[in-house]
Amino acid sequence: MILSKRPHLMIRKLSEMLVPRSRSAAIKPEEYTASPRSPLDLNFPSPVHSKRFGSGGVGLGIVAALEETSNGINRHDPVRYSGRFRCPEIDLSDEEYTYVTSPNGPTKVYYNDDGFELSENDYRRVHKPMVTVDEPPVIERQSVRGPTEFLSSCCLCKKKLQGKDIYMYKGEMGFCSAECRSVQIMNDERQEQCKTQVSRNADVLSSPYAAGQRLSAGVFVF
């Protein structure tokens, strides 16, 4: 009997050295399957049960852990972006408004008759009245004669122009003939020459050189 027990003890020790106790204890007797004898005995794993990994497979456990963490991440989540510039709200009910932006300065909004300056740094609104430039009044062109007398008679000989050819001069003076118009042109040119001569004489008299010549012409004896 003693000789028969020794081989069993040696086999048990060798089995414990090759297979740890934790793993051998985890394996149940009903999990042992006999070797298949025919193709019908082959049990292929289904896709549903293929993801159930055993406790002994370290690499498969890492893959399963990575899949679980990746399932919790939604790759299609939109990226949220918060802009730095926030424009304060302006009550624009029914009035018209215009935005005027410049590349280096703040944004200005002209609303109705008031100007609002929007600063990008401290998000404040400054009320500024708009400066309106007064346009100069339009100078009405003065006509030589009234509207009732316009083109009713010749400006030189005073003949009636009704039913006759009219010769215009300067766009507002009508004459009965080319001769009257030529006389008027000559009179205007003579007046212009007289004006230029008078202004030239005034400039000569007011110059210091002309005053020196008048003083040097006289002889004073003491």
UniProtKB/Swiss-Prot annotation:
GO BP: any one term: cellular response to hypoxia
Classification via Pfam families: zf-FLZ
Stretches that traverse the bilayer: none
Subcellular location: Nucleus; Cytoplasm
Domain of life: Eukaryota
Keywords linked to the UniProt accession: Cytoplasm, Metal-binding, Nucleus, Zinc, Zinc-finger
InterPro entries: FLZ12/13/14, Zf-FLZ_dom
Function: May act as an adapter to facilitate the interaction of SnRK1 complex with effector proteins, conferring tissue- and stimulus-type specific differences in the SnRK1 regulation pathway.
Zinc finger boundaries on the chain: FLZ-type: 149-192
The UniProt record lists the keyword Thylakoid: no
Family, as annotated: Belongs to the FLZ family.
Induction (free text): Down-regulated by NaCl.
A GO-annotated cellular component: cytosol
Protein name: FCS-Like Zinc finger 13
Molecular function in Gene Ontology: kinase binding; zinc ion binding
PANTHER family for this protein: FCS-LIKE ZINC FINGER 12-RELATED (PTHR47208:SF5), OS02G0174800 PROTEIN (PTHR47208)
Subunit structure: Interacts with KIN10 and KIN11 via its FLZ-type zinc finger domain. Interacts with KINB1, KINB2, KINB3 and SNF4 via its N-terminal part.
Organism expressing this protein natively: Arabidopsis thaliana
Record's keyword annotation contains Zinc: yes
